[in-house]
Design a protein with these regions (language model features):
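C-terminal transmembrane helical hairpin of 12-TM major facilitator-type secondary transporters
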Residues: 266-311
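Helix-loop-helix hairpin linking two adjacent transmembrane segments in secondary transporters
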Residues: 97, 126-180, 222
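Helix-to-loop junctions at the C-terminal end of transmembrane segments
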Residues: 59-70, 252-265, 349
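Cytoplasmic helix-loop-helix junction between adjacent transmembrane helices
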Residues: 95, 101-139
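Conserved MFS/SLC helix-loop-helix module at the cytosolic interface between two early adjacent transmembrane helices
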Residues: 57-96
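Paired small-residue
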Residues: 81, 85-88, 96-105, 291-299
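Helix-breaking motifs and short loop linkers at transmembrane-helix boundaries and internal kinks
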Residues: 38, 70, 91-97, 232, ...
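Extracytoplasmic gate region of multi-pass secondary transporters
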Residues: 203-243
Length: 389
């Protein structure tokens, strides 16, 4: 049993690492792709846009159907489609086919990422659910600081197309591994009607994630530009700063599991939001303080992603019969928050400058805390009236 659990965690971790690499590796490759297809950088940016929009739309569907039909088969399907889409990206004869390939990739990842979270929540022991989730989440976050640089290195020696070939081959191997790993996991057989109230409650719950994403990505999307503008950082210093952030995110996810299992999902998810708001104020005050910026970015990511992981565990605990659709909507909420955060960041920069970004993020963290606390009160009221369930 212990051995099977380790295998499941490893397969989940490496699968999410691949999904994260596919997400994070595209942006650094856009200049090379733009040059090869002779299109503007703005046009190549649509590779990212169509991926995220497709993911956000498709993820709730796969979450809903996996709650009824089982998750393993859809994860396997997603990985096969992932392999096909990345092969198509690698060998696209035109820019139109390249865009189509990224739409298919977004559809594939929508069938994989949220369902991995959900199936880990299904099989994890109740007293270890936070730890198990934190481990697989760290796979996705490791791609932030390891997967993308490895891909960029491959581009240097073999060209950008080679990266997608490698991901296509890896996806095929993981399709086999995931099929064998999850084929014994029983279907959840959820029969609840989400239309009558439950879906609205789920959307209300994942709105916390949307505001959390705003508190993280309003600054992170423009971090490199902010460090250059405010601190005159070199490319190497910016890369070092992003590495500190990425390592903090991975460690935050991992330690979150231990604290969540010990103190509970609600306490940790709320405490991290308050702490993050304070850290962001400090980040704003000391953004141009030299080497302190590395430490503050590390702590910000550590606390922020500890909160994200604990809140995922909280959602899984609160919606045991709808884990697939909850994780899917939570991931959709995350992408919506990233999009809104980037828009808010652009507005703040154009009106007040980069130095105001940390304070806007801090305000978003406070709003997320208020929503999270309100969610706790609603849960307590529901527990007091079990007949309504």
């Amino acid at each position: 049993m212990v051995s099977q659990g380790r295998v499941s965690l490893f397969v989940g971790w490496i699968t999410l690492f691949l999904m994260g690499t596919d997400l994070f590796v595209v942006s650094p490759l856009l200049p090379f792709i733009s040059e090869e297809y002779d299109v503007s950088p703005v046009m190549t940016g649509w590779m990212v846009t169509v991926f995220t929009v497709t993911y956000a739309i498709a993820a709730p569907f796969f979450g809903w159907v996996s709650d009824k039909k089982g998750r393993g088969i859809f994860i396997t399907f997603g990985l096969l489609l992932f392999s096909f889409s990345n092969a198509l990206t690698a060998f696209s004869p035109s820019f139109t086919w390249l865009i189509i390939s990224r739409i298919l990739a977004g559809l594939a990842v929508a069938a994989i990422t949220p369902l991995i979270y959900a199936i880990i929540g299904d099989i994890a022991p109740s007293n270890r659910r936070g730890t198990w989730l934190s481990i697989v989440v760290s796979g996705h976050l490791t791609a932030l600081w390891a997967g993308a640089p490895i891909g960029t290195l491959l581009e240097l020696f073999l060209g950008w197309r080679s990266i997608f070939v490698v991901m296509a081959i890896t996806g095929t191997l993981l399709a086999v591994a995931n099929f064998k790993t999850w084929k014994g996991v029983p279907e959840s057989n959820s029969t609840r009607n989400l239309i009558e109230g439950k879906l609205l409650r789920i959307i209300g719950s994942v709105s916390v994630t949307t505001i959390w994403a705003i508190s993280m990505y309003t600054l992170y999307v423009y971090l490199g530009a902010a460090l250059y503008s405010e601190n005159r950082f070199t490319s190497l210093e910016i890369a070092l700063a992003v590495s500190f952030y990425g390592i903090g995110a991975v460690l935050g996810s991992l330690i979150s599991g231990q604290f969540t299992d010990r103190f509970g999902e609600k306490k940790i998810s709320k405490a991290t939001l308050i702490l993050m708001a304070l850290i962001l104020v400090c980040l704003g005050m000391f953004f141009s303080s030299g080497d302190w910026i590395y430490f503050l970015l590390f702590i910000w990511a550590l606390v922020g992603y500890a909160g994200f992981t604990s809140y995922q565990a909280r959602l899984i605990a609160e919606y045991p019969k709808e884990r697939g659709i909850v994780m899917a909507w939570n991931n959709t909420a995350l992408y919506i928050g990233i999009t809104i955060g980037s828009m808010i960041g652009a507005y703040v920069i154009s009106n007040w400058g980069y130095s105001f970004l940390p304070y806007v993020c801090s305000l978003a963290a406070i709003i997320s805390f208020v929503l999270s606390a309100q969610k706790v009160q609603e849960t307590k009221k529901e527990s007091a009236f079990p007949a309504d369930r």
